[in-house]
C-alpha cells in the first residue's frame, strides 16, 4: 500500500463511482479498479460493494477512509515542512472553537494568520463545545478550544482560563442584576439549556457534573443553536446559565441582564486540546502560541471576563 493507492481509494469513496473517480485522479478506469482490488487483497476484505449504479463502502472501507485522510494529510505536512525548511509556518491547519472562543479571538486569529503567515491555510470551525470535541476526536481539526473535556487517554489538554457563569435573561424573569441569586432558586425558573446532539446539556456548561444534573432537571427547553437560544432569551421564553461573553451584545444593548449565582458560584474551564497520536507540526506549535497569546490579551483587557489558569 502506498500514498497513490490511498488517493485512488479516497477518490472512489468520495465519488461512489469508478468512472467519476478515474476522471478525478486522471487514470484509466481499469487501472483504478485494479488498484482497488489490490488494496482489498492486501487487507483481505472487501472495501466496496459493487452495484449497478456505483460503489458503496463497506464497514472496512469506512474505517480505511478515516485512516487514509489522516495518513495523507500527515504526509503532506511532512513534505511541506521538509521542503520549506525549519520553522517556516506553512501548509494547512484546522482549528475548532466553541462560540465563545470565536467571539473572543476568532477575527483576530484570522487577521494574524492572513498578515503574518501567508503560506499557512487556516480553517476555523465554530460549533458547540461538545461538537468541537468530536471534530477533534475524528481528526477534522488539529487544535480545539473546548470547555470541560472528559479525561481521555487520546487527548492532551491544557487548562487556559476559568469563567464564572451567570443567570442570563430578560429582567422580568431574572430579576435585579445587582442582587445575587442562590443556586437552589434556579429550579423555580424557566431554564433553557444548550444541548449537543441527543445527549444532555454539554459538559461545557459547568465544571460540576452534580450541579449540571440538577439544572438539567429544571430545564423547560433545550437548544442546539446559539442563535435560537439567544432569540428565545430576548423574547422572554426562558432564561439560561451562561457567561457574560456568550450574551455580550445583548447585555450591552440592555436586551438581557446577567445575575450572579451564589451558594455555590458556577464556573467552567476552557482547555486547549489536541490528539496525543497527532505529532505537533510547526504550524500547530505556532497556532497554539498565538491562540494562548490572544486569549491572554482579551482577558487582561477585560473583553473576556475570566481568570487565566497559570
Which residues does each PLM region occupy?
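A short LG(V/I)-centered, amphipathic sequence patch enriched
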Residues: 40-57
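Central regulatory/effector-binding core of bacterial HTH transcription factors
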Residues: 90-153
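Hydrophobic hinge/microswitch elements
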Residues: 128-133, 137-140, 146-147, 197, ...
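Secondary-structure junction motif
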Residues: 190-213, 280-282, 288, 297-306
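C-terminal effector-binding regulatory domain of bacterial HTH transcription factors
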Residues: 244-253, 263-310
Amino acid at each position: 500500500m502506498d500514498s497513490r493507492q490511498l488517493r485512488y481509494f479516497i477518490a472512489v469513496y468520495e465519488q461512489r463511482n469508478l468512472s467519476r473517480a478515474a476522471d478525478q485522479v486522471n487514470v484509466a478506469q481499469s487501472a483504478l479498479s485494479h488498484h482497488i482490488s489490490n488494496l482489498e487483497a492486501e487487507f483481505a476484505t472487501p472495501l466496496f460493494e459493487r452495484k449497478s449504479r456505483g460503489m458503496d463502502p463497506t464497514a472496512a472501507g469506512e474505517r480505511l477512509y478515516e485512516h487514509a485522510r489522516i495518513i495523507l494529510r500527515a504526509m503532506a505536512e511532512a513534505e511541506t515542512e521538509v521542503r520549506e525548511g525549519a520553522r517556516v509556518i506553512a501548509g494547512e491547519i484546522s482549528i475548532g472553537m466553541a462560540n465563545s472562543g470565536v467571539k473572543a479571538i476568532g477575527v483576530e486569529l484570522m487577521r494574524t494568520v492572513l498578515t503574518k503567515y501567508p503560506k499557512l491555510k487556516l480553517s476555523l470551525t465554530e460549533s458547540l463545545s461538545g461538537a468541537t470535541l468530536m471534530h477533534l476526536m475524528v481528526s477534522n481539526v488539529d487544535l480545539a478550544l473546548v470547555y470541560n473535556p472528559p479525561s481521555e487517554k487520546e487527548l492532551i489538554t491544557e487548562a487556559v482560563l476559568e469563567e464564572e457563569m451567570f443567570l442570563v435573561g430578560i429582567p422580568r424573569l431574572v430579576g435585579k442584576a445587582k442582587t445575587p441569586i442562590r443556586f437552589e432558586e434556579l429550579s423555580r425558573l424557566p431554564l433553557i439549556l444548550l444541548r449537543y446532539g441527543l445527549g444532555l446539556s454539554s459538559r461545557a456548561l459547568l465544571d460540576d457534573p452534580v450541579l449540571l444534573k440538577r439544572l438539567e432537571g429544571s430545564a423547560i427547553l433545550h437548544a442546539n443553536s446559539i442563535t435560537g437560544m439567544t432569540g428565545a432569551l430576548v423574547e422572554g421564553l426562558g432564561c439560561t446559565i451562561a457567561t457574560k461573553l456568550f450574551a455580550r451584545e445583548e447585555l450591552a444593548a440592555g436586551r438581557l441582564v446577567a445575575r450572579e449565582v451564589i451558594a455555590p458560584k458556577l464556573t467552567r474551564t476552557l482547555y486547549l486540546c489536541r490528539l496525543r497520536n497527532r505529532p505537533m507540526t510547526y504550524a500547530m506549535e505556532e497556532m497554539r502560541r498565538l491562540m494562548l497569546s490572544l486569549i491572554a490579551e482579551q482577558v487582561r483587557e477585560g473583553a473576556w471576563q475570566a481568570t487565566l489558569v497559570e
